[in-house]
Amino acid sequence: DVAPSRGLGDVYKRQVQLRNAEMCCEYIRPLFSDPKREEFYMIAMNDDYVPLKEIYIASGIPNRVQFDTHKLLRDAVASQCTCVVLAHNHPSGLAAASNADLLATQAIILALGQVGIDVLDHVILTPTNWFSMAEHGRVPQYNPGTGQLLFAARATWPMEPEKPKQIKR
């Protein structure tokens, strides 16, 4: 399913290029409507990191959400994306990845990797904060040659903006 009508407008989507985890969190946060239960979304993007579609995956109870990996895979392929960012919320306010979050992310990376779709990040939003699994080295890369996950360090984001340079006087 595509994100419900509270989603973001097509004009806005065409104008934004998501370059880092913070931009993804700001972009996706408006879709989270129920502060009492976990909700799970996926931002499907093209090679230029421009969102093609926000895809609603599932909602659950206050401390967990279950989802269908096959549905997630079908929706990602149907969007014709080349990469995605996963996003879910933690109503508890804990801005950290649980073991279940890490295992689910790995399963999704394996499934999407088999069809050539890269998972750039899995962000967790709380009412006041956010957590990027990629920025904490928790998003392995899919190796198409072996069909396995590579847990070696990887660049957090392909388009991370340069840090501002100090002007010397």
Where are these regions (language model features)?
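Short loop/turn motifs at secondary-structure junctions and domain boundaries
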Residues: 33-36
